[in-house]
Regions:
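Conserved AMP-binding/adenylate-forming core of the ANL superfamily
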Residues: 3, 22-52, 57-66, 70, ...
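Conserved pre-ATP/AMP-binding loop-to-beta segment of ANL
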Residues: 19-20, 148-184, 191, 214-220
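Conserved AMP-binding A3 loop
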Residues: 33-35, 180-204
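Conserved C-terminal "lid"/linker of ANL adenylate-forming enzymes
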Residues: 450, 475-486, 514-555
Length: 555
């Protein structure tokens, strides 16, 4: 598909065509129809215009997923301003820095995030507006204050017979290369960079979603991924909204219990999530329904009984609402044994590989054609290579170019030149192989690769994937200490204590796990020691562990 219309056309046409359909719902809260969204956008455009905010100015939004978060986003881009989504999980200092670095004129903020912020630390802002009810809590501009106070009067004067579809005429991007979004990375290295997305990237990513799995007007989609991250922004929001779907925002952490309850009520057609959520549901909700010991065995052994396969598939489908065509999993490595189990029972999942800098999609395939352990082929309008003399057998860095790519990092030409070379290839930092059909299999991140004194390259993710399936292991991290491999393990304390175990019992089980794991590993990557971690590892928005925080192991 070639780009025949602008991205804003996508949004405009969807609102007009689906005027009387439900658009955005906060789970157990408000519902906005497409016409309600259009009218709120119109009011915001009046406020922005009256306050002297111009196309190209930056507007930031920081808060949990909600219908009003989506309205703030849409009002910004349809006005021609640049939206700056900020993860609400960021520390206050980081949010202050992002607002200042992006030169945002306005900040839409959730009430919880606002509690921790200091307006004095963001001196460039004209105003700060609460997402809960769009009340301005800080106004440093008299025109902005007047516009907010009189927005209903101004709206009524401009549209005396109410706002109708024929009134919609949003500012269209002047070029596909025009800046639309600055998205600051969460990253595992501790430093946020502003990724600049042109409208070209938004269009290409959303168009690919529709090419792979067309969404129908009225289809239900549950938004679990943080909208402040580009994976959630594209898959859980723009993909569905541009097709007239009805989006539900959970507005809370997507625990297995909340997912089971909400999905049974909403019955979504498309589901996007990070691997951690699927892994927890399979291990804690699906397999134990049979028998805990048998369930764990099923992760490791082939399932030959068709009745067991059908039963397991039915149970897994029920947890996710039974109505979906496909679950799209991305954002972090997927546990190999959980994936093998899903493949065996014919569960409709697919892996999407990408990175923030590609907005985010690089590789993906429909579940019917996806190969085990692969993340699919290069998406349309993207070209992917493996920087290796033998890409089929020797892992090399994934490099890519195409329509999805960012413009660069905002106000950071040096960092841009380090990731995009002179020929336009983006260097992902991920290591992979590619088979003769073009299927890519990610082996690990080059920066995570551990190099031993003997010259062996070790990919910790592959070891962690095995360890995470062992008894009472919740999550793990493999690090190198004095040229020896050490496993940091956060046990599943709740499960262990529920079975009457004490600390000494947990330590013994972890040592048994180490011995069992080493039987499955070559001599050069044997684990010499286990260290128990008593808190969950700190993670990014994509639920990737922040490895840089745990490299110095003591004891």
């Amino acid at each position: 598909m070639e780009q025949e219309q602008g991205f804003i056309d996508y949004i405009e046409q969807s609102i007009i065509k689906n005027w009387d359909r439900n658009a955005l719902t906060d789970y157990k809260g408000i519902t906005l129809q497409y016409k309600d969204v259009a009218r709120k956008i119109a009011k915001f455009h009046i406020v922005l215009e009256s306050a002297g905010i111009r196309p190209g100015d930056k507007i930031a939004v920081c808060g949990r997923n909600s219908a009003h978060w989506a309205v703030a986003f849409l009002a910004t881009i349809t006005y021609g301003a640049v939206i700056v989504p900020i993860l609400h999980e960021f520390k206050a200092d980081n949010i202050h820095n992002i607002v200042n670095h992006s030169e945002a004129k306005l900040l839409f903020v959730g009430d919880r995030a606002w509690e921790n912020l200091n307006e004095e630390a963001m001196p460039l802002l004209m105003g700060i507006v609460l997402l809960t009810d769009f009340t301005p809590v800080v106004c440093r501009n008299e025109q902005l204050m007047e516009a907010f106070e009189h927005r209903n009067v101004l709206y009524g004067t401009r549209f005396p017979k109410n706002f109708r579809p024929e009134h919609i005429s949003y500012r269209k991007e002047e070029s596909p290369e025009e800046l639309a979004v600055i998205n600051y990375t969460s990253g595992t290295t501790g430093y946020s960079k502003g990724v600049m997305f042109p409208y070209r990237s938004l269009w290409s990513n959303v168009a690919y979603c529709h090419e792979m799995l067309p969404v129908r007007p009225g289809d239900h989609i549950v938004s679990m991924l943080p909208l402040g991250h580009v994976f959630g922004m594209v898959y859980d929001f723009l993909y569905g909204f541009s097709a007239g779907a009805h989006l539900y925002f959970l507005t809370r952490m997507p625990s297995p219990k909340i997912i089971a309850q909400s999905f049974s009520e909403i019955r979504p057609r498309v589901i996007s999530c990070v691997p951690l959520i699927v892994e927890k549901i399979i291990k804690k909700d699906i397999l134990p329904r049979i028998d805990n010991k048998i369930g764990k065995l099923l992760l490791r052994m082939p399932i030959v009984n068709d009745k067991i396969k059908a039963d397991m598939r039915k149970k897994a489908m029920e947890v996710f609402g039974s109505n979906f065509d496909e679950i799209i999993i991305g954002g972090a490595p997927f546990n190999a044994e959980v994936e093998r189990f899903l493949k065996q029972i014919g569960f409709p999942y697919t892996i999407a590989y990408g990175m923030t800098e590609c907005g985010p999609i690089i590789c993906s395939s429909r579940w019917e054609t996806l190969k085990l352990a692969s993340c699919g082929k290069a998406t349309t309008r993207m070209e992917v290579k493996i920087d290796s003399p033998d890409p089929q057998n020797v892992a090399g860095e994934i490099i890519c170019k195409g329509a999805n790519l960012m413009l660069g990092y905002y106000k950071n030409a040096e960092a841009t030149s380090q990731i995009i070379d002179v020929n336009g290839w983006l260097h992902t930092g991920d290591l992979a192989t590619m088979d003769t059909e073009g299927y890519v299999t990610v082996r690990g991140r080059s920066k995570n690769m551990l190099l031993t004194a003997s010259g062996q390259n070790i990919y910790p993710e592959e070891i962690e994937s095995k360890l995470n399936n062992m008894p009472y292991v919740s999550e793990s991290l493999i690090v190198l200490q004095n040229d020896k491999l050490v496993a940091l393990i956060y046990p599943d304390f709740d499960d262990a204590f529920a079975h009457g175990m004490e600390q000494s019992d947990i330590e013994k089980v972890m040592e048994d796990n180490r011995n069992e794991l080493n039987l499955q590993l070559p001599a050069y990557c044997q684990i010499t020691k286990v260290k128990i971690h008593f808190e969950e590892f700190e993670k990014t928005a994509k639920k990737s562990i922040k490895r840089f925080m745990y490299q110095e192991v003591k004891g």
